[in-house]
Design a protein with these regions (language model features):
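Chitinase-like catalytic core of GlcNAc-active glycosidases
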Residues: 1-83
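Substrate-binding cleft/loops of secretory-pathway carbohydrate-active enzymes
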Residues: 68-87, 112-126
Length: 178
């Protein structure tokens, strides 16, 4: 089962919600829950996820949480879609902090166009078609970043230089091998 966190405010009746989620998982034969929480604006989320994890675990089910909400007993999702740093270093640091047995890879297929310089580290997401169109319009060498475990190329346009980071079958396999 997948849970999102697009609601506003605190979660009312956390225990009731946890019981309802577990009952639905049992009813439908689900193996666990993925907490797809992209932000953490409310202080009750970690408590909610820890309680949910305990209830799921008691029924032999798993809870997968983002690293930003490391709920007790949950498997923690480590995103592989980096735009800076090193995937290996992130995995090693996270394994040391939480234990390798608690980690699960969130294998993200990245396709992003970054203007240079890019102090925010946030690029523009690309569709596969947009990526292919950029490659055709700006033919240049494609390189592999051992740190990011992704491929990239650069191009110049009227607005300046761009760095395009992307994954393919080879880079996704390399990320899994980490």
């Amino acid at each position: 089962m997948g849970l999102s966190d697009r609601c506003t405010g605190a979660i009312p009746r956390i225990d009731t919600l946890c019981r309802t989620i577990v009952a639905e998982c049992v009813k439908r034969g689900f193996q666990g829950v993925l907490a797809d929480f992209e932000t953490n604006p409310y202080s009750d989320r970690l408590s909610f996820l820890s309680r949910l994890s305990a209830r799921l675990s008691a029924r032999g089910m798993a809870l997968y949480c983002p690293l930003s909400l490391p709920a007790e007993g949950a498997a923690l999702l480590v995103g592989t879609g980096l735009s800076g740093g090193s995937l290996r270093a992130l995995l090693e640091e996270t394994a040391c902090r939480y234990g390798a047995e608690r980690l699960a890879l969130d294998l993200e297929r990245v396709m992003m166009d970054f203007p240079l310089p890019c102090p925010s580290g946030c690029g523009t997401p690309l569709t596969r078609e947009e990526l292919l169109a950029l490659r055709e319009k700006h033919p240049s060498s494609v390189y592999f970043s051992r740190e990011l475990m992704a491929k990239y190329f650069t191009y110049s346009a009227g607005s300046g230089t761009h760095f395009v980071l992307f994954d393919d079958a080879d880079t996704l396999a390399a990320k899994l091998a980490q």
